[in-house]
Amino acid sequence: MPTVRVKEGENPEYALRRFKRSCEKAGILTELRRREFYEKPTAERKRKQAAAVKRHLKKISRDVSSRRGVGHRRKKSTT
């Protein structure tokens, strides 16, 4: 659990902002949303597999688009 020490004379809003940032870094809210409802093991595997496929397709798309960038043009034929 993230903790934040409030300094003497510090604005409570700044302390709250630091606490929210530390919670975000720790991933508490995402974990809470994930555990809000029970997910069957098969559904969890299916979701993870779909996420892996999506990451893979995104990586392939990035690789293909970077190859089409400047400097990778076809040479003109001089015939």
Curated annotation (Swiss-Prot):
InterPro entries (UniProt xref): Ribosomal_bS21, Ribosomal_bS21_CS, Ribosomal_bS21_sf
Keyword terms of this UniProt record: Ribonucleoprotein, Ribosomal protein
Gene Ontology MF term list: structural constituent of ribosome
Any one GO biological process: translation
Tree of life domain: Bacteria
Region (Disordered): 47-79
Keyword check for Disulfide bond: no
One term under GO cellular component: ribosome
Cited NCBIfam families: S21p
Name of protein: Small ribosomal subunit protein bS21
